């Protein structure tokens, strides 16, 4: 019985130690969430403004034959996959990687995030770059460099489509793994936008098509950076939720173990009293 009580006591200490770690990780994730949410909110207007500008240019010259708008048979796809740099975030990494794995055909992968790079290296996928890009540390400048490489490869015909898999930040409790097509652009101006473009006095120099092509790398950079911001915020929210659940589970386990310990202690005391009484009677 004494050995059993000792084992329970050791297990309680082990769970308490784990609970301290999960609680600390929950607090760290919570402290980083505010800045991550601000990055998400600040990145969205930039992307929306660029998309609006591209739509206006497309509406002003609907006959333009821009390669970024042209749709042809997709023989090869560049897949940008954003995952986390660490684990212990519930199903965050597994969900986005599972979604990316559903992409079939001739695919080249640009992984962002340590877990994404490890996953596709393990599966021997053809990689766009051998550099490991950490999602939490990637800068706006790096996104612009990637965007120029992506648009240059698309323009040269190295791939016919660019898709992006990331985790959209809906709320602290909800994050959704999504896949979007970045290139070619699915841009169909409405009749109202076309009418407004005809009435506007905007002149694009040297031409609307060249201005459109010049903005595309900025647009792709904005999409990638925005997706990184959303993914990082989603990872922190998922980790906070997972660590909160782990902390609560650890607390419940400690309560159960304390109950078992007290019962074992009570049984040991009762046994000792019984033995003393039996010895006195003899």
Segments the model singles out, each with a brief description of its role:
Residues 1-282:
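C-terminal beta-strand-loop-alpha-helix "lid" module of Rossmann-like NAD(P)-dependent dehydrogenases
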């Amino acid at each position: 019985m004494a050995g059993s009580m000792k084992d329970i006591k050791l297990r309680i200490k082990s769970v308490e130690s784990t609970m301290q770690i999960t609680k600390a990780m929950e607090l760290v994730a919570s402290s980083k969430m505010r800045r991550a949410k601000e990055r998400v909110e600040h990145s969205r207007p930039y992307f929306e403004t660029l998309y609006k500008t591209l739509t206006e240019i497309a509406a002003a010259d609907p006959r333009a034959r821009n390669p970024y708008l042209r749709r042809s048979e997709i023989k090869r796809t560049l897949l940008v996959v954003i995952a986390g740099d660490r684990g212990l975030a519930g199903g965050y990494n597994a969900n986005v990687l599972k979604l990316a794995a559903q992409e079939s055909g001739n695919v080249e992968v640009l992984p962002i995030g340590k877990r994404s790079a490890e996953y596709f290296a393990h599966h021997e996928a053809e990689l766009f770059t051998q550099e490991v890009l950490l999602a939490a540390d990637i800068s706006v400048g790096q996104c612009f460099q990637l965007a120029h490489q992506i648009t240059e490869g698309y323009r040269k015909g190295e791939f016919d489509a660019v898709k992006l898999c990331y985790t959209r930040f809906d709320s602290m409790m909800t994050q959704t793994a999504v896949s979007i097509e970045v290139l070619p652009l699915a841009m169909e101006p409405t009749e109202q936008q076309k009418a407004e473009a005809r009435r506007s006095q905007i002149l694009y120099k040297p031409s609307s098509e060249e201005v459109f092509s010049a903005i595309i790398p900025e647009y792709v950079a904005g999409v990638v950076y925005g997706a990184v911001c959303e993914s990082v915020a989603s990872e922190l929210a998922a980790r906070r939720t997972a660590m909160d659940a782990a902390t609560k589970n650890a607390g419940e386990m400690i309560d159960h173990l304390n109950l078992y310990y007290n019962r074992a202690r009570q049984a040991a005391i009762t046994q000792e009293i019984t033995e003393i009484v039996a010895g006195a009677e003899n």
